[in-house]
Each structure stands twice: as C-alpha cells, then as structure tokens.
Regions:
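Beta1-alpha1 glycine-rich phosphate/pyrophosphate-binding loop at the start
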Residues: 2-75, 80, 166-206, 253
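Short glycine-rich anion-binding loops that position phosphate/pyrophosphate groups of nucleotides
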Residues: 17, 107-110, 169, 258
Length: 258
C-alpha cells in the first residue's frame, strides 16, 4: 500500500495493549504511539520489586527499544484534548497529531470501591514508585520491630484475593521466611501476614481446585487467609471490617481492583 494512502493511527498508551495493537497495525498503517513515559512497566512482576526479589530496573523497559525496527513512531507526552471533528489530538507539548483512527489504550487506575482510607493509608500496586514505597515501608516497619525483644508484632495486610494479591502475600511470606529471618529471626517470627478477600474464595476467576490449592500453599507459608471478609475502612494501623473484629495492619497493600 503506498505510504500516501496508508491510514494514520494514533495510539494513546504504551502498555501491553497499546504496544501489541501498534505492532499488529504497523504493517498496514502509519502508527504513532503516545505515552507520558518513555518506558513500559511489566506490571505482573511489581510484587517482586515490592518484596526485594527484583531491582526496579528489571521490570522497566524503554518503549523505543520495544518499537525498534517496526517503523512505529513514538511521542512522549500526555493528551490534553481530542478534536473528533478534525481528527487530531493535542499533547501537553503543544504538538498536534492528526489521525484517521484513534486507539485509546491508557490502562486503568486502582479502584477503591468507595472504601474510606484507601488513598490515605493503603499502598497501591500500579507502578514502580508504588512498589518501592511498599518495599521501603515494609523494611522500615521491620527495623522498628527489631528494636523490641518482647512480644510486639508487625502485621502486614494485603487486601484483594486476585492474582496480584495472592502473589504479593506469598512473596511477603517468602521474604519473612528467608532474608528477614536470616537477618533477625526474632523479629521475623513476630510478623503476621494477612490476605483479605471479600468473596468466598481467593482467585475466583480460576477453578475451585486451583483456588483451594493456592489457599493451602499460602497457609503453609504462614499467611492468614481471610475469605468472606469485606473491608469497611482502612485506618492508619488497622483494617475495619463490615463484620467481625478489626485486623491489625501497620502496612496495608491495596490489591483489590488492580
């Protein structure tokens, strides 16, 4: 197809969806990808960054590297307006990109389901920055715990029993059983890890057999799995439930709605 007659496609977002769409369309169209960052974050491995299993640069990859040799153009910036009549999108750099087709692949943000305190007291799992915040907070709390030689305990709660929450709870348990216990066994033995799920089972999108196996494995790792446990409010050092006693939580990781 001659270049002059190839449709112009602008894709907003350089995540998995945006980049895959760009590569699929590049053969028959002139494609431009727009993202506010010039790197892509491999979200499924953020839990490893949160628990010191991986360095941050292991889950971040340059967008231009992913597009090298494809003929796809890249612009770093954020869209501030779309003119549907004239088929153009304006970026915060003041650049205007014209298109025949516009693909919006901007991803999603964490849903708090209207639960009070999530923003103030919960730590999300959507970016490297958030993953590093979780790591720093867990380690800070562990160092605080290390000062005590009595029965003072540290509780870390993960809210959300989907894949992200299950992986996070398991990784925290491995961190506790491995590096932290090797550094200071007394403190590690006084850490409690909770996985809280509002529904009747964790990993509800998978088979009941797989859910049961995952819950069993978490129990073996020392994770307290709480199903049928709906959260009413997140406070600074505890989680208020819709029913039952509050759950202590010096650190709350919000993996619900991720």
């Amino acid at each position: 197809m001659p270049s002059s007659t190839r449709p112009r496609v602008v894709i907003l977002g350089a995540g998995f969806g945006g980049l895959n769409a760009a590569k699929a369309l590049a053969k028959d169209a002139d494609v431009t990808v727009v993202d506010r960052h010039n790197f892509q974050t491999f979200l499924p491995l953020l839990y490893q960054v949160s628990t010191a299993g991986l360095a941050a640069d292991h889950v971040v990859h340059p967008v231009r590297g992913a597009l090298r040799g494809t003929g796809i153009k890249f612009r770093m910036g954020s869209p501030i307006s779309v003119d549907h009549k004239n088929k153009s999108v304006k970026l915060d750099s003041s650049e205007v990109l014209e298109f025949d087709h516009l693909v919006v692949a901007l991803g999603s943000s964490t849903a708090d389901f209207g639960v009070p305190g999530v923003t103030e007291h919960g730590l999300g799992m959507k970016s490297v920055h958030e993953a590093l915040m979780i790591r720093a907070e867990v380690m800070r709390r562990f160092e605080d715990l290390a000062r005590f030689e009595d029965d003072t305990r540290l509780s870390i709660a993960v809210v959300g029993g989907g894949p992200t929450g299950v992986e996070m709870a398991g990784a925290l348990a491995e961190l506790k059983r491995g590096p932290l216990k090797n550094d200071l066994a007394h403190a590690a033995n006084h850490m409690d890890i909770y996985l809280i799920e509002a529904g009747p089972r964790i990993l509800p999108m998978f088979s009941e057999k797989l859910s049961a196996r995952a819950e069993s494995d978490l129990h073996k790792l020392g994770v307290f799995v709480k199903t049928n446990t709906a959260v009413r409010e997140i406070q600074s050092r505890k989680i208020i439930l819709k029913e039952g006693e509050p759950i202590p939580a010096e650190v709350t990781v919000w993996a619900a709605g991720v």
